[in-house]
């Protein structure tokens, strides 16, 4: 698969998918894969909300500015326009498929996408840090970074 448009999905589009979008855009640029567009949305997002301060902070510390981001609520049009949809937890899968049943083949968990067959995963979900201490955001960021690195590596191989 060589996607041109990736959609990252969480619940509120203010923490996890924002981190994943910022990291993925940054890593894709570094890898010279600028032709890939990365967007994010939330299954229950309040449109126009800014990322949490904690999200902005962990991204800022990684050299990524997300202050311009505004939350978007997931729509069937967003799903139809994406080549690859990566969700943060298993509960997001039926939310995507309810809006667009034909998206099943292109919708995956971020944390397990690109793993080798049989590679073990302790928890396929990336827990929502909203309302939790900064340390929880930092752990969430590290989990997302590891998963995004794997996705970007798989895209780099696919584009060669």
Where do the PLM segments sit?
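Short polar/charged helix/loop
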Residues: 1-160
């Amino acid at each position: 698969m060589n996607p041109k448009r990736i959609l990252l999905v969480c619940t509120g589009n203010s923490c996890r998918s924002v981190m994943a979008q910022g990291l993925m855009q940054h890593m894709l640029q570094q890898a010279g894969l600028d032709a890939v567009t990365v967007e994010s949305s939330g299954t229950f997002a309040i449109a126009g909300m800014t990322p949490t301060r904690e999200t902005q902070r962990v991204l800022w510390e990684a050299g990524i500015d997300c202050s311009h981001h505004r939350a978007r609520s997931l729509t069937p049009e967003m799903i139809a326009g994406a080549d690859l949809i990566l969700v943060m937890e298993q509960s997001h899968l039926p939310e995507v498929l309810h809006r667009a049943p034909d998206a099943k083949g292109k919708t995956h968990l971020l944390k397990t996408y690109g793993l080798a067959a049989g590679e073990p995963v302790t928890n396929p979900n990336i827990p929502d840090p909203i309302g939790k201490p900064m340390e929880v955001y930092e752990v969430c960021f590290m989990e997302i970074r590891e998963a995004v690195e794997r996705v970007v590596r798989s895209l780099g191989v696919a584009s060669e």
